[in-house]
């Protein structure tokens, strides 16, 4: 069994360099919610050095709230903004001799595209226009995954180690209780259940079916790094290979 392990980088966290030794894919902020040309260049350089797959992490234009504010933008605006961000990272990557492999939206853009078909279509269309060979990463079972498939893109369905799930397989909103899993044992058990058995227990107790093709690691600091190492160790014990 194989699983991709991804992390969102270039967002001002101090643990990026160490995380790049533990993950197989990096989602690099493209300036709309965090990061700038210099951080993008530095993250790409480190990812290439560690053999980590490079991906764009486009967002709504929302640096004030770290891309976590809901926005109702016209699909054509989202298309143009997504195209812009992907293009910037692709060029920076190419200039350093690398190849960009995937795209994963950030924050509220990701969450809204999971449920809003028009928004999902705009993102998938932008990815396809940039490069039909790019992989589109989205929440397992979401509208974004469906849109990607409609454009003939390779999709990668994502699950979260440290997020609570609702009965329909969607994430518990960050504004609600149960959105974040603080207990390391619970997060580890949830991740293994999703990867090995394709299901997750919701905060209301029901089992939801999920397809786990990539696992997202969140957080900064030693706690996040320690959990990443523990997860890698657990995967190794179960014979699960970490690879993009």
Curated annotation (Swiss-Prot):
GO terms for molecular function: 5-oxoprolinase (ATP-hydrolyzing) activity; ATP binding. InterPro entries: Glyco_hydro/deAcase_b/a-brl, LamB/YcsF/PxpA-like. Its EC number is 3.5.2.9. Belongs to the LamB/PxpA family. Forms a complex composed of PxpA, PxpB and PxpC. It catalyses: 5-oxo-L-proline + ATP + 2 H2O = L-glutamate + ADP + phosphate + H(+). Disulfide bonds: none annotated. It holds the Pfam family LamB_YcsF. The lineage of its organism: Bacteria, Pseudomonadati, Pseudomonadota, Gammaproteobacteria, Enterobacterales. This is 5-oxoprolinase subunit A. Catalyzes the cleavage of 5-oxoproline to form L-glutamate coupled to the hydrolysis of ATP to ADP and inorganic phosphate. GO terms for biological process: carbohydrate metabolic process. It comes from Escherichia coli O157:H7. Keywords: ATP-binding, Hydrolase, Nucleotide-binding.
């Amino acid at each position: 069994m194989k699983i991709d392990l991804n992390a969102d980088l270039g967002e001002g966290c101090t643990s990026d360099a160490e995380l790049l030794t533990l993950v197989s894919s990096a989602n690099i902020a493209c300036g709309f919610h965090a990061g700038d040309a210099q951080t993008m260049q530095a993250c790409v350089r480190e990812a290439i050095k560690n053999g980590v797959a490079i991906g764009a992490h486009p967002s709504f234009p929302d640096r004030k709230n770290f891309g976590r504010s809901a926005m109702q933008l016209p699909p054509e605006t989202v298309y143009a903004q997504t195209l812009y961000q992907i293009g910037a990272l692709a060029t920076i990557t190419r200039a350093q001799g690398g190849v960009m492999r995937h795209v994963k939206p950030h924050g509220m853009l990701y969450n809204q595209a999971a449920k809003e078909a028009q928004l999902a279509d705009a993102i998938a269309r932008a990815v396809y226009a940039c490069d039909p060979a790019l992989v589109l990463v989205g929440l397992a079972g979401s509208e974004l995954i469906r849109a990607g498939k409609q454009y003939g893109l390779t999709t990668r369905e994502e699950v979260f180690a440290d997020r609570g799930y609702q009965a329909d397989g969607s994430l518990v909103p960050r504004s609600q209780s149960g959105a974040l899993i603080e207990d390391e044992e619970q997060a580890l058990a949830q991740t293994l259940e999703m990867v090995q058995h394709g299901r997750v227990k919701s905060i209301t107790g029901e089992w939801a079916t999920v397809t786990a093709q990539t696992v997202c690691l969140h957080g900064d600091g030693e706690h996040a790094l320690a959990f990443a190492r523990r997860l890698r160790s657990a995967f190794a014990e179960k014979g699960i290979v970490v690879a993009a």
